[in-house]
């Protein structure tokens, strides 16, 4: 996620987290923010926050922080063209909780501005559903990048 940048206070926040012994038992994620101030961006940010909190599904563009022991216990990243972050967090949250880091991670709006943001979010949700149903990852990757 090369288009994402952390906010100014991220180092201080991460130090507070990693200094606590219990923090290694959780996957951590930042607050997803899109740089441009548009209503549809704020709606998407709210949807991401709700999904992350209630469904325990933060994705890679939220800057996942995972202790190496938890990472390896969960099997690490699978060799997937797409959905590798979803695959990892799904395995982690079967036994462990994902917790919010109260700091922002800013994502460029380029990929979101190329198409209607609502249509893009729906397309992504459909791709995730197909992935969970076992569709071929190569076909899903082609569909994602089309």
Model region roles, listed by residue range:
Residues 1-5:
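The conserved acidic donor/metal-binding loop of glycosyltransferases
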Residues 46-54:
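Short, glycine-/aromatic-enriched active-site segment of Class I SAM-dependent methyltransferases
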Residues 61-75:
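Conserved nucleotide-sugar donor-binding
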Residues 65, 82, 99:
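Short aromatic/basic micro-patch
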Residues 82-88:
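Acidic donor-binding loop at a coil-to-helix junction in glycosyltransferase catalytic cores
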Residues 90-146:
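Hydrophobic helical membrane-anchoring modules
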């Amino acid at each position: 996620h090369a288009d994402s940048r952390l906010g100014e206070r991220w180092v201080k926040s991460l130090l507070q987290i990693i200094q606590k012994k219990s923090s290694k038992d959780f996957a951590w994620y930042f607050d997803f923010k899109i740089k441009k101030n548009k209503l549809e961006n704020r709606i998407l940010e709210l949807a991401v926050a709700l999904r992350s909190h209630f469904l325990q599904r933060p994705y890679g563009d939220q800057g996942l922080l995972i202790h190496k022991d938890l990472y390896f216990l969960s099997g690490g990243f699978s060799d997937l063209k797409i959905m590798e972050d979803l695959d990892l967090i799904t395995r982690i949250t079967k036994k462990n909780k994902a917790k919010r880091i109260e700091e922002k991670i800013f994502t460029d709006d380029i990929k979101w501005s190329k198409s209607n943001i609502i249509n893009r979010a729906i397309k992504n949700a459909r791709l995730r559903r197909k992935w969970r149903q076992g569709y071929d990852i190569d076909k899903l990757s082609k569909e994602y990048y089309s």
